[in-house]
From Swiss-Prot:
It comes from Halothiobacillus neapolitanus (strain ATCC 23641 / c2) (Thiobacillus neapolitanus). This is Carboxysome assembly protein CsoS2B. Expression of 10 genes for alpha-carboxysome (Cb) proteins (cbbL-cbbS-csoS2-csoS3-csoS4A-csoS4B-csoS1C-csoS1A-csoS1B-csoS1D) in E.coli generates compartments that resemble Cb, contain RuBisCO and have its catalytic activity, showing it is possible to make artificial, functional Cb using these 10 genes. Cargo proteins can be targeted to these organelles. Artificial Cb assembly in E.coli requires csoS2-csoS4A-csoS4B-csoS1C-csoS1A-csoS1B-csoS1D (but not the gene for carbonic anhydrase, csoS3). Residues 604-838 are annotated as: C-terminal domain. M-repeat repeats lie at residues 260-309, 319-368, 379-419, 435-484, 494-539, 545-594. The gene is csoS2. Seen in gels as 2 forms (of 85 and 130 kDa, equal amounts of each) which have the same N-terminus, called respectively CsoS2A and CsoS2B. Partial tryptic digestion and mass spectrometric analysis, as well as the presence of the shorter form even when a C-terminally tagged version is engineered, suggests CsoS2A is shorter at the C-terminus, but its sequence is not known. It has been shown these 2 forms are produced by ribosomal frameshifting. The keyword rRNA processing does not apply. Its main location: other. GO terms for biological process: carbon fixation; viral translational frameshifting. N-repeat repeats lie at residues 16-35, 91-110, 172-191, 218-237. GO terms for cellular component: carboxysome. The keyword Repeat applies. Disruption phenotype: Does not grow in air but does grow in 2% CO(2), called a high-CO(2) requiring phenotype, hcr. Cells do not make carboxysomes. Also absolutely required for carboxysome formation in E.coli. Required for growth in ambient air.
Length: 869
């Protein structure tokens, strides 16, 4: 039986190639081809399953391929010189060292993508491994991958915060970190290399990997399949293949010594080369004093302060400074100019120094505010010859500007050795005038010839030098700019130049309109038939037939314009005077030509509103500023029809005899259709006696608290409206001047009866004022006075001692003050005392239990917890 002969496919899964061949030959020798057919069928089925699984893995691998951290580390380690990374070169070296350790442990698959291989996978031979060795290898690979990922994350964080620490490779590091973050954001943790598989897996399982044993492959395909499986699962415990060809000897970057000669920079910006003694990140123990400034020779570069400190100290003063002289030549050495830290050398700082210039131009400008001027002529001049442009240096053979009389022959050609340079402009600065000058006209044209304009060396030609000349222009535009500081008006062109509508040029005498010519406005904007002789530049401008203006009162006037025009002369007289009668010109006439605008005339018909809001129109009969003599009674109220509007009276309150005590009357209106007008406040009508008698003067001396403005009494006496209380109401009360107090009804009746009789004014009796008041002796009646001021001759209060006359309700004058008038009978008011005999309802029991502070005898109505009822 095939099952008994050992040809079961399940038993062949763990055999090698030689063992399979030996088993096949043994089966053929015992059973013949029957055993081969069963084996072939089972092998074909396993081959198809392996092919299908390989195709699926190939599709999946093309989707899940993502760059790993090892590939990103390859880009950083590809730089030959790690010193280009600046102060973080040691960190990059550590990253490259970890990458090489991972490659030496895992192999080249650490640098590949995380996806599965895209080919058919063939299992390796079964090799027996030690389980402990496999687990240790897996842990080592996992730790190396984690450390590489952490190191790359730290480098990216430094590149984001301080990219200058990577030196010239800062942009490369940031680009790599940006690609890493993009991969993590798109693919998540798949962008991070997973835990590498154990190298002993295929050897432990042998040929049990699905698809590894493929008998259908022969020769080249089988070798390719074998290499793919070695690439995927490794060689197990077998040693790796040695490289073929020439091997380049390379020094490990981790063991490489630092450079002997490095370049640094001082705080002043100078470059320093040699062995660097700055602080390094991999050296500990030198942290104290890292950020302190060093006096003397600077052996600590600015890179140390940039890497480890947040601030940079100020550089020391330079020993050798480079300054410039007044002529711009550099001078180096110890600076001896004035400084702000030294006092006492202010005298003579801004004076010119003769001899050698040791004061720099920069110091002169900073201390004096102006640039230094050269004190003497240059001893050595530099120039170039006119023909061959060779440099000529030495004493200047040209005439200086302070020497006159050597103008003759200054511009002639020199034979022999040429000692003059090509700077001909220096010869004519203060020398003789040129024979042929070049000037410009007002229109901008060039004029050459003998200059006949005004000169600074010629006097007597000042008259008329700035006037315009008609005819040929022989005065240059430069003369007006230098002597007159004005720009003359350009004369019209004799030959004009214009363009047609199609862009063709037209020259000759222009027949276009001009601003100086009037009367040719009609037809200026019309089209021209026939030959086009020009294009109108000024279109329109004529006077309109109908124009709209506004009169002084604001009324609109339209029609033909009759006011002053700029193109019309002779009508200036009386142009700013007002016109009586119908206004045929408005405000637009006065504003551009007159200094002021006249006031409009009075309106014949006026419209206003009464205090009740009624409209009144007609002739104005109120007071006016232009009319005098009607001031009397202008503020008095008018009975009957109201023919005076609210604009004149301001809606004043009515007479006091129509007012009732305690009632507030509000009179007035606001017109929303017309603009608001401000009116002067009128005089307040008198509400008291117009003749001040001694009796009235005595009453005015009475002072006290003013409670009259409100006109109402509040509080417990709220039903006492109309009662007279206090001093202010006594002062203005309607009562008899003489006699005893009367009831209110009787007093009002007597007042109405005596209103028709003439009032007899009492005689004024002159009284002598005592020089000083003398306190009266104490009496028994004075003891009835209580409160402030009961002491004799000592009055206390807010403001009782403002004068010599003591008034009020204190002292010996309290019992003899004016008696108050008796008012109407008061209504008996009910107080809380009357509720004592009223039966009270029984209090219900408390319905709240468990509350804090509850009481059965508490209040029935409360606002917090524990209320009863």
């Amino acid at each position: 039986m095939p099952s008994q002969s050992g040809m079961n496919p399940a038993d062949l899964s763990g055999l090698s190639g030689k063992e399979l061949a030996r088993a096949r030959r043994a089966a053929l020798s015992k059973q013949g081809k029957a055993a081969v057919s069963n084996k072939t069928a089972s092998v074909n089925r396993s081959t198809k399953q392996a092919a299908s699984s390989i195709n699926t893995n190939q599709v999946r691998s093309s989707v899940n391929e993502v760059p790993t951290d090892y590939q990103m580390a390859d880009q950083l380690c590809s730089t030959i010189d790690h010193a280009d990374f600046g102060t973080e070169s040691n960190r990059v070296r550590d990253l490259c060292r970890q990458r090489r350790e991972a490659l030496s442990t895992i192999g080249k698959k650490a640098a590949k993508t995380t996806g599965k291989p895209s080919g058919r996978v063939r299992p390796q031979q079964s090799v027996v491994h030690n389980d402990a060795m496999i687990e240790n290898a897996g842990d080592t690979n996992q730790s190396s991958s984690t450390s590489l990922n952490n190191e790359l994350s730290e480098i990216c964080s430094i590149a984001d915060d301080m990219p200058e620490r990577f030196g010239s490779q800062a942009k490369t590091v940031r680009d790599i970190c940006r690609a890493r973050r993009q991969a993590l954001s798109e693919r998540g943790t798949r962008a991070v290399p997973p835990k590498p598989q154990s190298q002993g897996g295929p050897g432990r399982n042998g040929y049990q990997i699905d698809g590894y044993l493929d008998t259908a492959l022969h020769g080249r395909d089988a070798a390719k399949r074998h290499r793919e499986m070695l690439c995927q699962y490794g060689r197990g415990t077998a040693p790796s293949c040695k490289p073929t060809g020439r091997v380049k000897n390379s020094v490990q970057s981790g063991n490489a010594a630092p450079k002997k000669v490095e370049t640094g920079h001082t705080l002043s910006g100078g470059s320093v080369t040699g062995t660097q003694v700055d602080r390094k990140s991999h050296v500990t123990g030198n942290e104290p004093g890292t950020c302190r400034a060093v006096t003397g020779t600077e052996y600590v570069g600015t890179e140390q302060f940039t890497s480890f400190c947040n601030t940079s100290p100020k550089p020391n003063a330079t020993k050798v400074n480079v300054t410039t002289t007044a002529r711009g030549r550099p001078v180096s050495g110890t600076e001896v100019s004035r400084t702000e830290k030294v006092t006492g050398n202010e005298s003579g700082v801004c004076r010119n120094v003769t001899g050698t210039e040791y004061m720099s131009n920069e110091a002169h400008f900073s201390l004096c505010g102006t640039a230094a001027k050269p004190s003497q002529a240059d001893k050595v001049m530099f120039g170039a010859t006119a023909r061959t442009h060779q440099v000529v240096s030495g004493s200047d053979e040209f005439r200086p500007s302070s020497v006159t009389g050597n103008e003759s022959g200054a511009k002639r050609t020199i034979t022999g050795s040429q000692y003059a340079d090509e700077g001909l402009a220096r010869l004519t600065i203060n020398g003789a005038p040129a024979k042929v000058a070049r000037t410009h006209t007002f229109a901008g044209s060039d004029v050459t010839g003998t200059e006949i304009g005004r000169s600074t060396r010629v006097t007597g030609d000042e008259s008329g030098s700035c006037r315009s000349i008609s005819g040929t222009e022989y005065l240059s535009n430069e003369q007006f700019q230098s002597f007159c500081d004005t720009k003359p008006q350009r004369s019209p062109f004799k030959v004009g130049q214009d363009r047609t509508n199609k862009g063709q040029s037209v020259t000759g005498n222009l027949v276009d309109r001009s601003e100086l010519v009037t009367g040719n406005e009609p037809g200026s904007c019309s089209r021209v038939t026939g030959s086009q002789y020009g294009q109108s530049k000024i279109c329109g401008g004529g006077v309109g037939k109908v124009r709209s203006m506004r009169t002084l009162r604001g009324t609109s006037v339209s029609g033909q314009q009759l006011d002053h025009a700029p193109k019309m002369s002779g009508d200036e007289r009386g142009g700013c005077m007002p016109v009586t009668g119908n206004e045929y010109y408005g405000r637009e006439h006065f504003e551009p030509f007159c200094t002021s605008t006249p006031e409009p005339e009075a309106q014949s018909t006026e419209q206003s509103l009464t205090c009740e809001g009624q409209i009144i129109s007609g002739t104005s009969v109120d007071a006016s500023d232009l009319v005098t003599g009607n001031e009397i009674g202008e503020q008095q109220l008018i009975s009957g029809d109201a023919y005076v509007g609210a604009q004149q009276t301001g809606c004043l309150p009515t007479s006091p005899r129509f007012n009732q005590t305690g009632n507030v009357q509000s009179m007035g209106f606001k017109n929303t259709n017309q603009p608001e007008q401000n009116f002067a406040p009128g005089e307040v009508m008198p509400t008291d006696f117009s003749i001040q008698t001694p009796a009235r003067s005595a009453q005015n001396r009475i002072t006290g608290n003013d409670i009259a403005p409100s006109g109402r009494i509040t509080g417990p006496g709220m039903l006492a409206t109309g009662l007279i209380t206090g001093t202010p109401e006594f002062r203005h009360a309607a009562r008899e001047l003489v006699g005893s107090p009367q009831p209110m009804a009787m007093a009002m009746a007597n007042r109405n009866k005596a209103a028709q009789a003439p009032v007899v004014q009492p005689e004024v009796v002159a009284t002598q004022e005592k020089p000083e008041l003398v306190c009266a002796p104490r009496s028994d009646q004075m003891d009835r006075v209580s409160g402030e001021g009961k002491e004799r001759c000592h009055i206390t209060g807010d403001d009782w001692s403002v004068n010599k006359h003591i008034t009020g309700t204190a002292g010996q004058w309290a019992s003899g003050r004016n008696p108050s008038m008796r008012g109407n009978a008061r209504v008996v008011e009910t107080s809380a005392f009357a509720n004592r005999n009223v039966p009270k309802p029984e209090k219900p029991g408390s319905k709240i239990t468990g509350s804090s502070g509850n009481d059965t005898q508490g209040s029935l109505i409360t606002y917090s917890g524990g209320a009863r009822g």
